Each structure stands twice: as C-alpha cells, then as structure tokens.
Amino acid sequence: MASVSISCPSCSATDGVVRNGKSTAGHQRYLCSHCRKTWQLQFTYTASQPGTHQKIIDMAMNGVGCRATARIMGVSLNTILRHLKNSGRSR
C-alpha cells in the first residue's frame, strides 16, 4: 500500500499530522500535533467562487427570493443577504 505524506498548511510539518475524523460531507480531516490546526484537503467554499456575487444579484433582479436563491446555489441564507447588502458598495 502506498503512503502519502501530508504536510500541515500552517507550519509545514509532515511528521505530526494525524487523521482527525471526517467532515459532514465525508471528507477526511487532519490534525497537526505541532500547531494543533485542523484542515481537510478537499475543502471548497461555494460562496467565494468567481461569479457567485453576480449570480446572486441577477437572481434577485429576476424576482427569485432569497431563500430560493440560497437553496439553488447551495450557500447559506446569510451569504445571500450579505451579498445583497454589499451590492450597493463598489466591488
């Protein structure tokens, strides 16, 4: 069986990295015993992808509700509200 060494993104240590359960999506979580930070390799934050802000604004202008927009895009309602609140500010 092949061994893959995983390094800590915070302190770059490779010898003190241990598995630390799974996320709600089923992805493996890791813990660094040196700096005590936890992380997962397959993490993606949907709300920060390019074009998300414009999609939220477009859906709001086309009459789609905030909760429906959140459900369709797979982000939280608070994310939708934050984007709409900040849409008046320059980006």
From Swiss-Prot:
Belongs to the IS1 elements InsA family. IS1-D is an iso-insertion sequence of IS1. The keyword ATP-binding does not apply. The gene is insA. Keywords: DNA recombination, Transposable element, Transposition. One of its GO terms (biological process) is DNA transposition. It comes from the Bacteria. It holds the Pfam family HTH_Tnp_IS1. The keyword Hydrolase does not apply. This is Insertion element iso-IS1d protein InsA. Absolutely required for transposition of IS1.
